[in-house]
Regions:
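Conserved ABC ATPase signature
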Residues: 109-113, 117
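Catalytic Walker B motif of ABC-type/P-loop ATPase nucleotide-binding domains
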Residues: 134-137
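C-terminal boundary and immediately downstream tail of ABC-type ATPase nucleotide-binding domains
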Residues: 198-218
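Conserved ABC ATPase "signature" region
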Residues: 90-105
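H-loop/switch region of ABC-family ATPase nucleotide-binding domains
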Residues: 170-171
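Conserved catalytic motifs of ABC-family nucleotide-binding domains
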Residues: 72-87
């Protein structure tokens, strides 16, 4: 999958200038960087929510995309009904609810869930379908460590089993190490480093990434 170069400008200021990248099927890419580095803008452009300055989709027109934003949404119906909006496979829905510890919330109104419960439901809903590319923007930010690890296991399995390319925006270096094959580091709207997660996070090549890793490892 070829991700073409693109840029994004707000009020005359370039907030993202991306050089392009070839993405591997079945691989998980973590996107890291400080607040304001361009991570979420990058995710929204790939999801088709924001337009690039070039007014073209950097992925082309025939790539199916699944997107889980930072702020999750729920319809005023049960948790199970919300999940089934992603696909009508009842067995798949039940399996995902079991694995994400949502079964006891089966009949609860989804708009009354806690933040962590809502995130798990949104993840289950997305995983009801297969996509060429899946973008998860801070999917576990509202979860505790136990459910974070459950979600990470499912995310990794989903990429492996479906063969989709998965992009995970995260603030957690530990999460990037645990589940991603490659990591992309953004700073001030630029991709500063990209490569194997183990290599990149353990032996940064640039001073910018070295300082970032040291700060977020405290």
């Amino acid at each position: 999958m070829i991700l073409k170069p693109f840029s994004k400008t707000y009020e005359g200021i370039t907030v993202l200038d991306f050089p392009g990248l070839e993405l591997r099927p079945g691989a998980v890419y973590s996107v890291i960087g400080a607040n304001g580095s361009g991570k979420s803008t990058f995710a929204k452009i790939l999801a088709g929510i924001l337009r690039t300055d070039e007014k073209k989709r950097p992925l082309g027109e025939n790539v199916s995309v699944g997107y889980m934003p930072q702020k999750n949404y729920a319809f005023r119906m049960t948790v199970r009904s919300n999940i089934l909006l992603g696909g009508r496979d009842e067995q798949r829905a039940q399996k995902l609810m079991d694995e994400l510890q949502l079964s006891h919330l089966n009949g609860k109104r989804a708009d009354r869930l806690s933040g962590g419960e809502m995130a798990r439901m949104a993840l289950a809903r997305l995983m009801m379908k297969r996509f060429d590319l899946v973008i998860l923007d801070e999917p576990t930010a509202a979860m505790d460590m136990e459910t974070t690890l459950l979600a990470e296991k499912l995310i990794r399995e989903y990429a492996d089993q479906t063969g989709c390319t998965l992009i995970l925006v995260t603030h957690s270096l530990q999460q990037a190490r645990r589940i991603s094959d490659e990591t992309i580091f953004f700073r001030k709207g630029r991709m500063v480093e990209q490569g194997s997660s183990a290599e990149l996070l353990n032996t940064p090549k640039t001073m910018e990434l070295k300082q970032f890793v040291e700060f977020y490892s405290l």
